[in-house]
Amino acid sequence: MHNKFYRGRFAVAPMLDWTTRHCRYFHRQFSQQALLYTEMITAPAILHAKYDLLEYDPAEQPVALQLGGSDPTQLANCAKLVQARGYTEINLNVGCPSDRVQNGMFGACLMANADLVADCIKAMQDVVDIPVTIKHRIGIDTLDSYAFLCDFIDKIQPYSQDFIVHARKAWLSGLSPKENREIPPLDYERVYQLKRDFPQLNISINGGIKTIDEIKQHLTKVDGVMVGREAYQNPALLGEIDQQLFDQNQPLITARIAVENMLPYIEQQLSKGVYLNHIVRHMLGAFQNCKGARQWRRHLSENACKQGAGIEVVEQALRFVTE
């Protein structure tokens, strides 16, 4: 079926240590339409890794890869590899404020150098056919005026039409990455204003969004919505996405259905030597607000890490839950 909607109408945000390939496979059980993102992977890591950092299951599609870096040549070389592996999109991280990221000269600190960001985006888009997008903040430190944000967008828009805007500024020192996701106030109106002032661009909004109703409200003002922590901690939210946001005529995907659909994948991964805990740690929030959710989490947490833990751990945990 032809999808009449913008491809980024709803996306699950890239989250370091969280949106692994196992997490994405689980999220895909809830929604066929949501755009899923990898964790951020740095360009040098991809180019010099001794093992395959680009591995994913085709069932995860559509899936986008988020890159970290600031060397246009390195990023272009990575982009070619990413496209060859079949990813739907490449996203440049210009939003992460951690010290480790800044020391590598990528993430939110790049907002202070829009010309370099433009060079990076252009270098990648010149060598691939898939979209190259950018995820960024509304400002950094004292560079937080609306004029600064517009100038940043204006320099990059010749090379990318897709901007994912975390509706908070970032402090590059003094706040941890976690604090930078919570302390700077959200300014959704500033993102809405960007869409009004740059109507030709695809503008997606990110930050603090938790419910289907909130998502729908944002979609009256911008092209796409990206949800991070809520999608991870309460993945059952994703079970409503196709029906509510994409007019798909299908029943609600419950957490139990999604977990049961995961069982063959879990068995397959266990047969390849993957530890059970590496998969089910992303499933702990599946039954949030359901009777038995605490027992579900406890049983998985206490047993999935044991030597030889298998599919029976998940099957036993399911018996505790009533939706």
UniProtKB/Swiss-Prot annotation:
Residues reported in the UniProt entry to bind FMN: 14-16, 66, 135, 166, 206-208, 228-229
EC code(s) of this entry: 1.3.1.-, 1.3.1.91
Active site: 96 (proton donor)
PROSITE patterns with a match to the protein in the record: UPF0034
Necessary cofactors: FMN
Keyword NADP recorded: yes
Molecular function via GO: flavin adenine dinucleotide binding; FMN binding; tRNA binding; tRNA-dihydrouridine20 synthase activity; tRNA-dihydrouridine20a synthase activity
Swiss-Prot/TrEMBL keywords: Flavoprotein, FMN, NADP, Oxidoreductase, RNA-binding, tRNA processing, tRNA-binding
UniProt-listed Gene3D superfamilies: 1.20.120.1460, Aldolase class I
InterPro entries: Aldolase_TIM, DUS-like_FMN-bd, DUS_fam, DusA, tRNA_hU_synthase_CS
Reactions accelerated catalytically: 5,6-dihydrouridine(20) in tRNA + NADP(+) = uridine(20) in tRNA + NADPH + H(+); 5,6-dihydrouridine(20) in tRNA + NAD(+) = uridine(20) in tRNA + NADH + H(+); 5,6-dihydrouridine(20a) in tRNA + NADP(+) = uridine(20a) in tRNA + NADPH + H(+); 5,6-dihydrouridine(20a) in tRNA + NAD(+) = uridine(20a) in tRNA + NADH + H(+)
Site feature: Interacts with tRNA: 93, 178, 181, 294, 297
UniProt enzyme class: oxidoreductase
PANTHER family per record: FMN-LINKED OXIDOREDUCTASES SUPERFAMILY PROTEIN (PTHR42907:SF1)
Functional note: Catalyzes the synthesis of 5,6-dihydrouridine (D), a modified base found in the D-loop of most tRNAs, via the reduction of the C5-C6 double bond in target uridines. Specifically modifies U20 and U20a in tRNAs.
Family note: Belongs to the Dus family. DusA subfamily.
Cross-referenced HAMAP family: DusA_subfam
Protein name in UniProt: tRNA-dihydrouridine(20/20a) synthase
Source species taxonomy: Bacteria, Pseudomonadati, Pseudomonadota, Gammaproteobacteria, Pasteurellales
